[in-house]
């Protein structure tokens, strides 16, 4: 999540300097990969050449050539302009979907931050994580909307989670809103 919010991650967006920062599959173009970064003295614990006690690190996909090539390709497209464009698209999508629900007199909104969103079928304003989890979703209605979106080629999770990606443009936003 943190990498999507700003080019420099959540720490750029909200300020602060974390001891550790973790990135998920977005850095691999959706393939199974992650990365950990942090202060030098913490990262030194992972250094196998340090000659002192360290933390073992590794994994099934560590250094996997396909994943590394995909990650390199994804990160060459992940520019400051691309992040800003996606986040602006996310804001427009949320505004447009919210307007559709309001005009129809229906309970619903698209909550989220940056290029991430969650369809919430409620009139209660979703301000934070707490309000999102205390709000019960009418699952029959959510299932019907999810099914319709899938029929139109729009993929979100069954609970309404979704995200925008760099190849998307205004036509994808239009399709979602319709």
Segments from the language model and where they lie:
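Conserved N-terminal phosphate-binding loop of PLP-dependent enzymes in the Aspartate aminotransferase
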Residues: 1-178
